[in-house]
């Protein structure tokens, strides 16, 4: 056992021995009992609710502990400075965009809340994005101001100067406490519902990233649905390790706990060692909730395999995780079943899989307390309506409905049982528009107002299953349609494969050929012939990869996703095609 974990293990051993590992009972969820009557409007921003939680600890980061009252006061001070700088006489930016670049710490929350308090739309930037992308986001959103943490000031100053956008550096008071109280200027508690709140930029797999503009109502709809379905309470403590420019990191992992008065422990960035230390620490507050992408869970298991080798240590880790942590969630990318099973063996937790995207927040989720089925994304969350459809070549109706459901249940059209189709979503969580792109916004919705996700899905066994992006994950080969994600799930069970991406490569004979891009376990080898022989035992003949490409590493973004269009371009430059079986 590594020395840095020895002390936490000893402390935990005695605390757990004394309690005899009695399972913690998680009581049924009571919706926000601490919320004052004046704040029961479900569409208010999260900072309006902060005063109800006063001196409770909201955040713990490298700078220390920060209460809800402190977050509110510091945010209000910054909001007033923003208004002074921008010259807004009535204290309202009228939805002007405020870009901000902050680390995963208290500065992010203060910048976000201040953007809202001043009447602006928050545009979060990410420090790992290249300068050209940061410039694009600031320019495309037409931000009137850029708020920046001290550590990024030198990097952003030339960029802001070139764009002619004012730069507002954060002061030490944001991190360590205000030296003066904000001017008494109460923030309005009504009128937020339809105002713009945040612009999240999409991954840009079909061109330049688009800014998805969500209102305060949209954000609140996602948050309240998750708070109810996942039983968030003020006693929860979540460990935050994800980037803060996507729905997963911002809404699921930050706004949800702050909505109910819970505590968020923020790491500057992901570290497998630090995550395990937090899981196993006997010091208060102890982690009760964890959410991450599959890549994070994979790296945590790599650390587990290297450092927790003794059986009694593994038993100890499993016991602590089961007793202390009530919920572990995976999302943003498909969760390989072997990874789910290995995590369950190590921690006793079956990861909760869910489905969402930038434009809709969260839409589908496995149950909190009932059985979770690997590979399924469960059923609709509260307030969400979904449809699975196919285009209708006949006049009179825009499409044929295969299945239609909400949180109360799903109705399947006779004759369309277990038929795949495009997933549509409708509800208060669906975004308002693509910023400054009316035509793209219009084409993203059906004529009757449903958002087109671009994902292929199926309803079977009383659950929804995502087959993948229709554009890249549904491969048409020899007259068959096969799911790249399904093939990937099976191939990841091969003992020599550590990562895989399945792509459809244009082919004169088959239309597309199934190509497996594979990263191998260290010291392993794999031929195409061996892979085909193995795959025939788990896949239909037409789904067996006709080509194998071996790579050192499969490129993934910060959320664990593979840009398959870019991967195809990298592996097959214009005019070049490798022969089947290469690798």
Curated annotation (Swiss-Prot):
<feature type="binding site">
    <location>
        <position position="561"/>
    </location>
    <ligand>
        <name>ATP</name>
    </ligand>
</feature>
<feature type="binding site">
    <location>
        <position position="469"/>
    </location>
    <ligand>
        <name>ATP</name>
    </ligand>
</feature>
<dbReference type="GO" id="GO:0090409">
    <property type="term" value="F:malonyl-CoA synthetase activity"/>
</dbReference>
<feature type="binding site">
    <location>
        <position position="455"/>
    </location>
    <ligand>
        <name>ATP</name>
    </ligand>
</feature>
<feature type="binding site">
    <location>
        <begin position="202"/>
        <end position="210"/>
    </location>
    <ligand>
        <name>ATP</name>
    </ligand>
</feature>
<keyword id="KW-0809">Transit peptide</keyword>
<dbReference type="GO" id="GO:0090410">
    <property type="term" value="P:malonate catabolic process"/>
</dbReference>
<keyword id="KW-0276">Fatty acid metabolism</keyword>
<protein>
    <recommendedName>
        <fullName>Malonate--CoA ligase ACSF3, mitochondrial</fullName>
        <ecNumber>6.2.1.76</ecNumber>
    </recommendedName>
</protein>
<keyword id="KW-0067">ATP-binding</keyword>
<feature type="transit peptide" description="Mitochondrion">
    <location>
        <begin position="1"/>
        <end position="27"/>
    </location>
</feature>
<dbReference type="GO" id="GO:0005524">
    <property type="term" value="F:ATP binding"/>
</dbReference>
<keyword id="KW-0443">Lipid metabolism</keyword>
<keyword id="KW-0547">Nucleotide-binding</keyword>
<dbReference type="GO" id="GO:0016878">
    <property type="term" value="F:acid-thiol ligase activity"/>
</dbReference>
<dbReference type="InterPro" id="IPR025110">
    <property type="entry name" value="AMP-bd_C"/>
</dbReference>
<dbReference type="GO" id="GO:0005739">
    <property type="term" value="C:mitochondrion"/>
</dbReference>
<keyword id="KW-0436">Ligase</keyword>
<dbReference type="InterPro" id="IPR020845">
    <property type="entry name" value="AMP-binding_CS"/>
</dbReference>
<dbReference type="GO" id="GO:0006633">
    <property type="term" value="P:fatty acid biosynthetic process"/>
</dbReference>
<dbReference type="Pfam" id="PF00501">
    <property type="entry name" value="AMP-binding"/>
</dbReference>
<keyword id="KW-0496">Mitochondrion</keyword>
<dbReference type="InterPro" id="IPR045851">
    <property type="entry name" value="AMP-bd_C_sf"/>
</dbReference>
<dbReference type="InterPro" id="IPR000873">
    <property type="entry name" value="AMP-dep_synth/lig_dom"/>
</dbReference>
<comment type="function">
    <text>Catalyzes the initial reaction in intramitochondrial fatty acid synthesis, by activating malonate and methylmalonate, but not acetate, into their respective CoA thioester. May have some preference toward very-long-chain substrates.</text>
</comment>
<dbReference type="InterPro" id="IPR042099">
    <property type="entry name" value="ANL_N_sf"/>
</dbReference>
<dbReference type="Pfam" id="PF13193">
    <property type="entry name" value="AMP-binding_C"/>
</dbReference>
<comment type="similarity">
    <text>Belongs to the ATP-dependent AMP-binding enzyme family.</text>
</comment>
């Amino acid at each position: 056992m590594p020395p840095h974990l020895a002390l936490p293990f000893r402390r935990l051993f005695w605390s757990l021995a004394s309690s005899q590992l009695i399972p913690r009972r998680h009581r049924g969820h009571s919706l926000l009992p601490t919320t004052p009557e004046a704040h029961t409007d479900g569409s208010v921003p999260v900072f309006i609710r902060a005063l109800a939680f006063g001196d409770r600890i909201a955040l713990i980061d490298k700078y220390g502990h920060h209460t809800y009252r402190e977050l509110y006061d510091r945010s209000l001070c910054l909001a007033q400075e923003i208004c002074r700088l921008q010259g807004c006489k009535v204290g309202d930016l009228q939805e002007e965009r405020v870009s901000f670049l902050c680390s995963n710490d208290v500065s992010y929350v203060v910048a976000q809340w201040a953007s809202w308090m001043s009447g602006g739309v928050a545009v979060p930037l990410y420090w790992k994005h290249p300068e050209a992308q940061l410039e694009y986001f600031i320019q495309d959103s037409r931000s009137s101001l850029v708020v920046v943490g001290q550590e990024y000031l030198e990097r952003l100053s030339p960029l802001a100067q070139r764009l002619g956008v004012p730069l507002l550096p954060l002061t030490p008071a944001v991190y360590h406490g205000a030296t003066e109280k904000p001017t008494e200027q109460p923030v309005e508690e009504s009128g937020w519902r339809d105002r713009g709140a945040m612009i999240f930029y999409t991954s840009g797999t079909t061109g330049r990233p688009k800014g998805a503009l969500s209102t305060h109502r949209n954000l609140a709809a996602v948050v309240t649905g998750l708070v109810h379905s996942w039983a968030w309470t003020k006693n929860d403590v979540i460990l935050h390790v994800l980037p803060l420019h996507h729905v997963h990191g911002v809404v699921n992992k930050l706004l949800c706990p702050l909505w109910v008065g819970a505590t968020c422990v923020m790491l500057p960035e992901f570290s497998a060692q630090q995550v395990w230390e937090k899981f196993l620490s006997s010091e208060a507050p102890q982690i009760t909730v964890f959410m991450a992408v599959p890549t994070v869970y994979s790296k945590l298991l790599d650390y587990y395999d290297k450092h927790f080798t003794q059986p009694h240590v593994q038993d100890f880790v499993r016991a602590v995780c089961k007793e202390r942590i009530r919920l572990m969630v995976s999302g943003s990318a498909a969760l390989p079943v072997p990874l789910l099973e290995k995590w369950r063996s190590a921690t006793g937790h079956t990861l909760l899989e869910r489905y969402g995207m930038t434009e809709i927040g969260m839409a589908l989720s496995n149950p909190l307390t009932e059985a979770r089925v690997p590979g399924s994304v469960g059923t609709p969350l509260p307030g969400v309506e979904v449809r699975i459809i196919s285009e209708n070549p006949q006049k009179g109706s825009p499409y044929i409905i295969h299945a239609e459901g909400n949180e109360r249940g799903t109705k399947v059209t006779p004759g369309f049982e277990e038929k795949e189709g495009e997933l549509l979503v409708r509800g208060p969580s669906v975004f308002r528009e693509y910023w400054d792109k009316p035509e793209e916004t219009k084409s993203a919705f059906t004529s009757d107002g449903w958002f087109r996700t671009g994902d292929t899905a199926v309803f079977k066994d009383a659950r929804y299953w995502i087959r993948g992006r229709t554009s890249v994950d549904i491969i048409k080969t020899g007259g068959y349609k096969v799911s790249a994600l399904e093939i990937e799930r099976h191939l990841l069970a091969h003992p020599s494969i550590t990562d895989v991406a399945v792509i459809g490569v244009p082919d004169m004979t088959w239309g597309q050929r199934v190509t497996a891009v594979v990263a191998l376990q260290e010291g392993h080898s794999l031929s195409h012939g061996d892979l085909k022989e193995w795959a025939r035992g788990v896949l239909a003949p037409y789904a067996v990869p006709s080509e194998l490409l071996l790579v050192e590493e499969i490129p993934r973004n910060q959320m664990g996703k593979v840009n398959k269009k870019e991967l195809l371009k990298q592996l097959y430059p214009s005019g070049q095609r490798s022969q089947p079986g290469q690798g």
